[in-house]
Amino acid sequence: VFTIIVPTHNRPTLLSRTLKSLIAQSYSNFHVIVVDDAAAYIPPYEDLSALKGRYTYIVRSGVSGPAESRNMAMKLTNSRYVMFLDDDDTLEPGHLQSLAMSLESNSPALLFCDFKVQYEDRTVEPPQHLSSDTVSIADATKDSVFVRNRIPNSCLLYRADVLSDMSYDTEMDIYEDWDFLLACLKLNDLVHLPINSVNIHKSQANAPENMRRGNTRDDLIAQAMLMLYKRHPALNEEARQARQSLMAGAGIASPLTDC
């Protein structure tokens, strides 16, 4: 029923934690595709063997980054639904079971759920848990995602046919997941599932992985958002005005025609 795509880059401890959360799932009809773009360590054979054949592990060359890894994995999927799980996030044991039960009565094109944020200190090994927050994004809509995306990639489930001819932009430094979601939403709608069994693990803002991806660079964020606004026009006047207002709040004057 599910293919779970996990791109990874030189984070063996975090990847092992993610895989262990999949091993612990009460629902077993899924396949995991791990794509490693660094080949800097021995694959986690113990974790993979516990998946009992329900995995594909790929070591790829070329430019590092999750976009190309996800694109490669998408070509190998043959399930009803596809999930993109970051290599530092985890699923609680009943997550896939809850998803499967919700799909018994309907087959939404895109499904999303709430989540928990697990703050942690990654300067120690293994990471030390600091605090938790529960986050509801039940009010997220298709229109709101065209203004600002609050849905973590790991909280989304895509019906396989939605992904036909879709690919992640490998040239983007940040927000390639938002770009991908917007492309999928042009012809499809979002459905919310009120569960919060996805754990989004976060390190300090100045952690190396955040600096590498540009997530702390306000100038990159604004530039990327404006590019996405041009690439994916708002669906209605209200969304265009909301985009303009959001940019104005950041001190950026953007003509309505660019929103």
Residue ranges and their predicted role:
Residues V1-T3, S21, H31, D179:
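Cell-envelope/extracellular polymer assembly enzymes that use nucleotide-activated donors
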Residues F2-L14, T18, Q25, V35:
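A conserved hydrophobic helix/loop-capping motif in glycosyltransferases and polysaccharide synthases
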Residues R60-T77:
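Glycine-rich, basic loop-to-helix element that forms the pyrophosphate-binding segment
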Residues V135-A222:
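Conserved nucleotide-sugar donor-binding catalytic segment
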